């Protein structure tokens, strides 16, 4: 599922070229410089986080590295136009590979946190033991994902990556800043259109697959909007706040889906059904009870989606260079 979602996220990146190229303006030149500085900062943050990934790493480190890899990849995609050179493609590909390598590791960390919360909430010893059963199922799975990710991360030289980024960003600009500005605006407008289409399908079908697609569309929209905001389009602050709230609500729903799948896999084994039937019954009952909240989660998502702030024209806010 994670790999499929990543592929959808990659394919969502639009390649739009301006038909007529106007002369560069002070605002467009300023935005190009701002984006260059922003890209350097994101490279620095990404390179600083990557070495902190260890088997005993705080789950927040894994989460933060995945977030910053998306931010970095989005900035690279926006800054370098297509067709991209092999070096630029590598600059874009490395954070994507690291993020994918950490996907299941991150899922296990989230699930273990949910299981611990379930154990703290219940007063029933039987339920506590049942959730401990799920925890014992998840721990070796996490260890396997940590080992798998570790092997993949060893193949990524972040120091070399930082040097490559510095070299590419130090090259003279070969593109009119106005074209870059238009590409940034078009990418956000395209994401809005894709988001609206995904929302319509999710509302019409209520299908889990379509809700997952809407989740990805929301993620794409948020990262593109965030990038535009960071390069002086400050009128998008309200939209960013709304997107963060919407993504949090979708995240709650998504975590439940991942939990349901993990519990189902944990109990749907022959030895469990033969030797741990009382535990399986308790977990299935817990699952059935929890799924009653699923429709409430979905309706909350659609309600938040309908509360989108007014979509203002994409006009940069002039600001002095700092």
Residue positions per predicted region:
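Function-determining surface determinants
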Residues: 1-322
């Amino acid at each position: 599922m994670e790999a499929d979602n990543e592929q959808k996220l990659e394919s969502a990146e639009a390649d739009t070229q301006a038909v007529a190229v106007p002369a560069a303006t002070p605002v467009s030149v300023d935005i190009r410089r701002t984006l260059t500085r922003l890209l350097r900062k994101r490279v620095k943050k990404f390179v600083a986080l990557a070495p902190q990934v260890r088997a005993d790493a705080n789950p927040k480190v894994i989460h933060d590295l995945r977030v910053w890899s998306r931010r970095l990849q989005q900035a690279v995609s926006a800054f370098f136009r297509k067709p991209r050179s092999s070096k630029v493609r590598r600059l874009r590909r490395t954070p994507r590979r690291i993020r994918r390598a950490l996907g299941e590791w991150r899922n296990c960390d989230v699930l273990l946190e949910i299981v611990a919360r379930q154990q703290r909430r219940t007063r029933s010893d039987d339920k506590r033991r049942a959730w401990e059963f799920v925890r014992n199922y998840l721990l070796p799975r996490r260890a396997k994902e940590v080992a798998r990710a570790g092997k993949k991360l060893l193949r990524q030289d972040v120091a070399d990556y930082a040097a490559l980024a510095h070299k590419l960003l130090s090259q003279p600009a070969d593109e009119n800043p106005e074209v870059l500005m238009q590409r940034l605006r078009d990418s956000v407008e395209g994401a809005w259109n894709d988001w609206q289409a995904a929302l319509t399908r999710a509302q019409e079908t209520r299908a889990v697959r379509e809700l997952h697609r809407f989740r990805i569309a929301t993620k794409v929209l948020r990262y593109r909007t965030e990038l535009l905001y960071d390069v002086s389009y400050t009128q998008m602050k309200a939209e960013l706040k709304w997107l963060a709230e919407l993504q949090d609500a979708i995240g709650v729903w998504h975590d439940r889906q991942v939990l349901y799948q993990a519990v189902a896999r944990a109990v749907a084994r022959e030895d469990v059904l033969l030797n741990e039937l009382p535990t399986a019954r308790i977990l299935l009952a817990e699952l059935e009870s929890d799924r009653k909240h699923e429709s409430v989660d979905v309706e909350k998502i659609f309600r938040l989606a309908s509360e989108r702030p007014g979509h203002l024209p994409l006009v940069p806010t002039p600001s002095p260079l700092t």
